[in-house]
Every structure is written in structure tokens, then in C-alpha cells.
Amino acid sequence: MASNPEERNSDKQKALDNAISQIEKAFGKGAIMKLKQNPVEKIDTISTGSIALDSALGVGGLPKGRIIEIFGPESSGKTTLALHVIAEAQKKGGSCAFIDAEHALDVLYARKLGVSTDDLVISQPDTGEQALHIVEYLVCSGAVDVIVIDSVAALTPRAEIEGDMGDQHMGLQARLLSHGLRKLTSAVSKANCILIFINQIRMKIGVVYGNPETTTGGNALKFYTSVRLDIRKIGVIKDKENITGNETRVKVVKNKVAPPFREAKFDIMYNEGISKLGEIIDMGAKLGVLEKAGAYYSYNNTRLGQGRENVKTYLKTNKEVANEIETKIRDLLRNHDNSIIIDEDSEQLLEESVF
């Protein structure tokens, strides 16, 4: 028996080396290693198409090799956000797939958001099992960067489709997802792709205290996701009497790669998607790139206009100024590790119950 600490440490190291050697013989080289042999200096990400949301995520976008969930009420912008992620991935030369379980993808709208629909791989599966098998094949190919499943609620188990309309099928979808995610999690990590689940909200019956909202598909998806985004419409944007878009808020209710409970606000314009000009104005004022006095906005002692919509019109016609402001905003965020100061609304999230 070793008589001093150094000899004991040496014996432990020999035992560990022997164990590692046996594991590699049994499971192959690379099955186990010390972290310094495979260091990760920076998380690889894909932009969401929103400057504010990229900042709120803390790493500059959605992390690759992870499972993401985007959930919210109807017509809140879930699919729009997912399509923007696809467009950003394609700009980097990535391949993307869209599993249209709802059979409701608007191809013309996707093109307006910048998605190259000619290069987009699309599937409209008949059952939930078929959808998850297709996803597994795509992930294991290692050739796809982003896969979007729209939506979890539409992943109908085969037994439910083949049964009668009034039959009760308790927990079938939850078991389907639980089994599928157990297989997909490691495959997604090895393939270094992003798997996005779009999910809907349901109401719990009989809840008096606390949040009655929940998402479909059971609890498995909540555990396996690295990032969960709660997207909501908080207002409308009007041009005189016509409604031209929605004011949108996204809360990062779960984040395994950066501090959670941050939020981002941006505009989603009809037939246009996320308004980059609106974000430039809001983020510019927040970070001090733009000067705001009352309703007036200024940049480098030049008045841009009165009111947010007038400033958006100015920046739309003066693209060089808009690009210059955007560059300064991104530089500031990069110098602060893509994180902005959490505002009062975000601080309140720490005290809310997240389902």
C-alpha cells in the first residue's frame, strides 16, 4: 500500500489509465478522453435573424449540436422565427430541412423571408413515427445543419391515425417523443446540427394558482432541449388604419449555454418577417449608438426623425447609415460577449414560474 500522497496519486493515475485503455478497447478510440484533448473554445452558432434575440441568447445565436424548442400561442411568429434561422444557415452555405407535419408551409412567404426554397429539403410525413425516422436519417447523414419540425402537436402517433375518431389514446404522443429524443440527442450532438421543435400551448384544467399554460408532448422535450424560447405577440404595428405587423417579445426560459431569463423585443412585419430596421433603432438607443430625446432620434448629431416609424422610413432610404449603425451595434455586443444588460422585464422572469 502506498505510504505517501504522491505514491497514492500515482497509483490512482495508473488505475485510471488502465480503465481508459479498457474502455477504448471495448468501445473504440474516442469513446472516452480528457477534455484538454478536445477543447471547445467557442460555441458554434447560427443567427436567429434578430440582433436582439442573438444577444439575449448570450452566444450570438442558436448553438449547434443542440435541440431547441420554440413555443407560443397561435400566430405569434413561431414558424417565422424558425424560417429566419433556416435563411441565416443557408447564407452560410448550410443545408436545411423542414418537416412539415402540419402540411401548412407557405412557400411564397418563406421566400420573402430569405429562404432559398429550391435548396430546402421538405417532408410532409403521415405519422409521428415517420417524421422522427426521417429526422433520424437526416441527422445521422451529417449533411444537414438545421432541421425544423413544425409542429410537435401535429406529430400524431400511428395508432391514433389508424384508430376510430372517438378512441382515447392517453400518453401515446409523449411516449413517442420520449423514445425519439433519447435516440436523437446524441446523434444531433455528433452531427453538430440544430434540431428545432415548434410547439403549441395548451391550458391545464383546474389550475387556480400559478401558470395554467403548458406545452404539448409531455415533459421529455423540456428536459432534452438546450434552449427554450417563449414567443408572444405583445402589440400591433399600424400604418394609419392598416395593421402592418406585430410587436413581438421572446423570452429565453431555458438556456444551457448562457444565463437564461433574458428577453428580446422586435417587430415582425407582414410579408417581410423580422424588421431589422426596428431592431437597429431599439438596440441603437439602448446601447447609446443613437441619441434619443423625447420622440426624436439622432445619430452623429444628425436628426433621423420623430417617432420610431419615421426613423425606420429614413433608414430604409439611407441604407449606408443603417448599415453603419448595425455594424457599431454588433461590435458593441461582440465586445460584451453578445450579452446586454437585462432590463426590468427580464429581471421579473426570475421570479416567475417557468413551465
Curated annotation (Swiss-Prot):
It is found in: Cytoplasm. ATP binds at G72, P73, E74, S75, S76, G77, K78, T79. SMART domains: AAA (SM00382). Coiled coil: none annotated. One of its GO terms (molecular function) is single-stranded DNA binding. Transmembrane segments: none annotated. Its main location: cytoplasm. Pfam families: RecA (PF00154), RecA_C (PF21096). GO terms for biological process: DNA recombination; DNA repair; SOS response. Keywords: ATP-binding, Cytoplasm, DNA damage, DNA recombination, DNA repair, DNA-binding, Nucleotide-binding, SOS response. The keyword ATP-binding applies. InterPro entries: AAA+_ATPase, DNA_recomb/repair_RecA, DNA_recomb/repair_RecA_CS, P-loop_NTPase, RecA-like_C, RecA-like_N, RecA_ATP-bd, RecA_C_sf. GO terms for cellular component: cytosol. The keyword Nucleotide-binding applies. Can catalyze the hydrolysis of ATP in the presence of single-stranded DNA, the ATP-dependent uptake of single-stranded DNA by duplex DNA, and the ATP-dependent hybridization of homologous single-stranded DNAs. It interacts with LexA causing its activation and leading to its autocatalytic cleavage. Belongs to the RecA family. This is Protein RecA. It comes from Wolbachia sp. subsp. Drosophila simulans (strain wRi).
